[in-house]
Amino acid sequence: EHTIVFFWRQNRPEQLQKSLDRKFNIVLCPRLPMYLDYAQDTLQVHGVDWRKFSCNSYQKVYSFSPQDIPVKYPKNCNILGIQANLWTERIETEDRLDYMLFPRIAALAENAWTKEMNKNINSFNIRLKKQFDLYKKDHIYYSDPFTPKETGEPVR
């Protein structure tokens, strides 16, 4: 009753199924797309080269659904929500941290509070572009997925 499972191994859906069957509380944080230390796009060159597995773009974070994991969800399952993880052993500066988080953290937030039937990536893109002025105002070094060459990747 007090156990919370953080499910991150999307390649092992049978483990999620066991947790669902045992009625554990579950937070979904699958590596693909919820590991924010993975590259955001193919232009990234520094740090761990996760591109051989996947780029975890803001679009993938935004569009992630529990239904992407092939399990049988009980009618009243205990999915508490979703979470993204950012492992920082290779992040040495605040700019690098910001770059890896933003705008994917905005995509995560909107994914978490928006019902599946109301998600619309085009509408989100309009709102996201407006966030960039706020990021600049707060000196957040973000990755601009619309013009990625204009927001160069920090080396570390």
Predicted regions and their residues:
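Substrate-binding groove of N-acetylhexosamine-processing glycoside hydrolases
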Residues: 1-156
